[in-house]
């Protein structure tokens, strides 16, 4: 139960990133528009006082502000899409539910425009509806409910005379009903909840703000490995605290208050729960990256320089720290704990210096410039000396502990990994043993990426042993184990089933010859990795980063690096000259190898293995040579959208030694057949 809840919280945390991703664009418009109307920038650029320029500045401020004014609705739509695998039907359901809930609450409580005029009432006008103000929390609740309706009813079957309303069309209907019902308990319970939240936040800030900001920074950083930090910081940024704007409206949340104060040009009081990240992300972590580079073995420094350099630059500019943090998190947990303490101390330091800095995305230089330097409303320059001190601390602490405790940070790994080896015929036996033996297997299945096993006793499963046998990851959901063996997962499942049925497994055709041992971790493909491989788009559609694919196996790159495409046409074409290496029996996935040796997996949609091949038409067979642009598979796009979790199609480089992918057209935007998708090295 606890692990199931943890998994759900992780999904919610990731779903919150979709609406949050909109904020930088809104913040950019708001920050530039506000700065152009301010005396500080006009002093240096007198020409912007021109009436036409000022009109544009006001329009930019309004365009950015409208996003922050409607954050609850945006969170409702974003959370619904994120938890429903990216399907737009969930967003429609969320919008329907959001307006129905607000309208019903307003009518039930008899809220009028006159009531809204009293800031203490807790009422507001939402999309023109006088109703109870539930804030971002209300949006998140509706988004989660819409996603539940989608996941529960998207493939529902109805009698033929109601067939038009079957499948995904049924989801908004159910959402209308459930949100109407939800409105009544929300109307009765939410005022008490809101009062409690306000009392908690006021007490927290009034009792000892210094301790509060330290604990916020410390805990938020510790939650990053679990993906729960988005849930933790949301109430601080969007609900805790209050401030009355010039129009008499009560604004809640540290980030929303900060943005509103920037927009109005008011005296800054917010930013306490954001500003501490600027010294860490712009100075501390890049210095840690330098320490990791300096402690790497000489023969590995060239590779480490590329990895750490790009991670440090990303942290400095954008405040995205995960690429750098995950490079030492698992091999040096003490360093990560110290990093979390320093993060908390950074929040405390800037609070004691009476700074008030905020951001729309993260604590990188871009937000620092737009919302700190340009508005010039606080002593933004104090971040620089604090950051330089942090850089020195991070560098010497990291360098000392890495050397002293012999941490295997990037570039310090042993030359030969202690990889387990198993011959091709031994592997299914070894996997079965690691799963606890035949008696422990309740249900055995597989798809193109993973072995899915429901076990009777999870304690009998040897997770490290599975990883030694080649699983790039092992996921646990209750008694359900998912071992990520990649394209050979189905073959392993088939052979395990034969063993459990008393049959002898001999010379699997999809694996290497028995005379060759399969070395799982240490594999010499240096010749292949030195080549440059051009991959063209196999589909027409919208490019999406793997990190946004709603499947942990792909988003965490357990299968390998790559990208995804949300198709607009139902065709898959060869992305290069090569050969068809493997076709999954249910036709939803195909493995290719290029003439230059690059191995590529194209997985059409998510959970499409459950369609059992329906909606797919093959035009090639295993072992067939293909030319770039040849038609490989036709698929019924409407059928997949109506019957599968998502139509988003991951395109994965399955060779672990190839990690340098250059996305020529970026990781977002539209792409067509034959356009260069990426270059792999």
Swiss-Prot record:
Q: Which residue windows are coiled coil?
A: none
Lipid bilayer topology:
Multi-pass membrane protein
Q: Where is the PTS EIIA type-1 domain positioned along the sequence?
A: 551-655
Q: Which domain of life is it from?
A: Bacteria
Q: Write down the Pfam families for this protein, in alphabetical order.
A: PTS_EIIA_1, PTS_EIIB, PTS_EIIC
Q: Where in the cell is it found?
A: Cell membrane
Please list the residues that make up the active site.
Answer: 447 (phosphocysteine intermediate), 603 (tele-phosphohistidine intermediate)
Q: Which PANTHER family match?
A: CYTOCHROME C-TYPE SYNTHESIS PROTEIN AND PTS TRANSMEMBRANE COMPONENT, PTS SYSTEM GLUCOSE-SPECIFIC EIICB COMPONENT-RELATED
Protein name, entry field? PTS system glucose-specific EIICBA component
Q: What species is this protein from?
A: Staphylococcus aureus (strain MRSA252)
Q: Which gene encodes it?
A: ptsG
């Amino acid at each position: 139960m606890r692990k199931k809840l943890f998994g759900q919280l992780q999904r919610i945390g990731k779903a919150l990133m979709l609406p949050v991703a909109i904020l930088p664009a809104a913040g950019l418009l708001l920050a530039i528009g506000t700065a152009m109307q301010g005396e500080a920038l006009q002093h240096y650029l007198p020409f912007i006082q021109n009436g036409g320029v000022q009109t544009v500045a006001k329009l930019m401020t309004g365009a950015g502000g409208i996003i922050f004014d409607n954050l609850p609705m945006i969170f409702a739509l974003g959370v619904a899409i994120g938890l429903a695998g990216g399907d737009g039907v969930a967003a429609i359901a969320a919008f329907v539910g959001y307006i129905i809930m607000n309208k019903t609450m307003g009518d039930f409580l008899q809220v009028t425009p006159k009531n809204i005029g009293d800031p203490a009432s807790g009422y507001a006008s939402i999309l023109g509806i006088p109703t109870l103000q539930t804030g971002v929390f209300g949006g998140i609740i509706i988004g989660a409910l819409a996603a539940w309706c989608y996941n529960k009813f998207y493939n529902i079957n109805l009698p033929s005379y109601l067939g038009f309303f079957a499948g995904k069309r049924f989801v908004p209907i159910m959402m209308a009903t459930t949100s109407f019902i939800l409105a009544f308990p929300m109307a009765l319970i939410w005022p008490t909840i809101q009062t409690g939240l306000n009392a908690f936040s006021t007490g927290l800030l009034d009792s000892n703000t210094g301790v509060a900001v330290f604990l916020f920074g410390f805990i938020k950083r510790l939650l990053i490995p679990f993906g729960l930090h988005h849930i933790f910081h949301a109430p601080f940024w969007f609900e805790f605290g209050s401030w009355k704007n010039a129009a008499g409206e009560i604004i809640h949340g540290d980030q929303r208050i900060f943005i509103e104060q920037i927009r109005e040009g008011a005296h800054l009081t917010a930013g306490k729960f954001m500003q501490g990240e600027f010294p860490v992300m712009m100075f501390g972590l890049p210095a840690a990256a330098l320490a990791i580079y300096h402690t790497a073995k000489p023969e590995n420094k060239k590779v480490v320089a590329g990895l750490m350099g790009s991670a440090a630059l990303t942290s400095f500019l954008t405040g995205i720290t995960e690429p750098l943090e995950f490079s030492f998190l698992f091999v040096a947990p003490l360093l990560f704990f110290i990093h979390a303490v320093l993060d908390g101390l950074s929040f405390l330091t800037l609070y004691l210096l009476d700074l008030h800095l905020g951001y729309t995305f993260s604590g990188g230089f871009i937000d620092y410039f737009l919302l700190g330097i340009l508005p010039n409303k606080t002593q933004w320059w104090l971040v620089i000396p604090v950051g330089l001190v942090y850089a020195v601390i991070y560098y010497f602490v990291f360098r000392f502990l890495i050397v002293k405790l012999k941490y295997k940070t990037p570039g310090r790994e042993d030359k030969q990994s202690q990889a387990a080896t198993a011959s091709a015929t031994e592997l299914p036996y070894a996997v079965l043993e690691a799963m606890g033996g035949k008696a422990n297997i309740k249900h055995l299945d597989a798809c193109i990426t993973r072995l899915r096993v429901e076990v009777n006793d999870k304690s009998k499963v040897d997770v490290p042993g599975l990883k030694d046998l080649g699983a790039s990851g092992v996921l646990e959901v209750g008694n359900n184990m998912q071992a990520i063996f990649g394209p050979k997962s189905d073959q392993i499942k088939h052979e395990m089933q034969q063993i459990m049925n008393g049959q002898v497994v001999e010379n699997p055709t999809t694996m290497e010859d028995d005379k060759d041992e399969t070395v799982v971790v240490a594999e010499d493909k240096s010749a292949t990795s030195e080549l440059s491989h051009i991959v063209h788009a196999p589909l027409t559609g919208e490019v999406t980063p793997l990190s946004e694919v709603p499947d942990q196996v792909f988003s965490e790159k357990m299968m390998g690096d790559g990208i995804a495409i949300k198709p607009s046409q139902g065709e898959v074409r060869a992305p290069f000259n090569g050969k068809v290496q493997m076709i999954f029996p249910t036709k939803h996935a195909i493995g290719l190898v290029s003439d230059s040796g690059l191995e590529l997996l194209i997985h059409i949609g998510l959970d499409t293995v459950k369609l059992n091949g329906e909606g797919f038409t093959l035009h090639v067979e295993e072992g067939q040579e293909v030319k770039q642009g040849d038609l490989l598979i036709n698929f019924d796009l409407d059928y997949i959208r109506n019957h599968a979790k998502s139509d988003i199609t991951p395109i994965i480089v399955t060779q672990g030694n190839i990690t340098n992918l250059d996305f020529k057209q970026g990781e977002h935007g539209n792409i067509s057949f034959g356009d260069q998708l990426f270059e792999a090295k």
